[in-house]
């Protein structure tokens, strides 16, 4: 209704989930913590969107996650279709474990610690950058007083 980023007033969705989204004037940007429906453990990510998504009137839905404040978030249909506003959701081991479980059979499978892996990669990048810069000069510039 507010014609955010387009002159289009309405547009049909794919029809995969019993949800409808209404665009809002204000963009939501926030860090969130959540629990995954049907899984153990908590996760975190961030939201960045202009919409409010609610179930289509008369339809039932299953929330995909529940935010830390108890608010249901996202939607899941069966085991093959999920919708969520949470960016970075696949960085959470509990989500990866949940996604892989139906295909792992009876094998005990657990995902690697992706956050630790990312931290390790950032440290490698920082070491590489430091090795090619005059760090004493940079620190001198940063601590110089006018």
Model-derived regions: residue spans:
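Conserved beta-strand scaffold positions in the cores of enzyme catalytic domains, especially
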Residues: 16, 45-47, 81-85
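Non-catalytic alpha-helical coupling and interface elements of nucleotide-dependent molecular machines
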Residues: 16-22, 53, 104, 108
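Short, functionally important structural connectors and interaction interfaces within domains
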Residues: 6-9, 67, 81-82
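Acyltransferase
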Residues: 72-146
């Amino acid at each position: 209704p507010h014609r955010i980023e387009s002159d289009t007033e309405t547009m049909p969705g794919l029809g995969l989930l019993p949800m409808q989204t209404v665009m809002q004037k204000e963009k939501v940007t926030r860090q969130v913590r959540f629990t995954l429906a049907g899984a153990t453990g908590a996760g975190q990510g961030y939201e960045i969107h202009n919409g409010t998504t609610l179930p289509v009137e008369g339809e039932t839905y299953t929330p995909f996650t529940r935010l830390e404040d108890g608010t249901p978030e996202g939607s899941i249909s069966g085991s093959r279709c999920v919708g969520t506003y949470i960016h970075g959701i696949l960085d959470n081991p509990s989500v990866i474990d949940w996604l892989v479980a139906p295909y792992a059979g009876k094998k005990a499978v657990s995902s690697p610690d992706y956050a630790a892996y990312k931290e390790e990669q950032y440290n490698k990048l920082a070491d590489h950058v430091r090795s090619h810069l005059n760090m004493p000069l940079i620190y001198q510039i940063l601590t110089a007083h006018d």
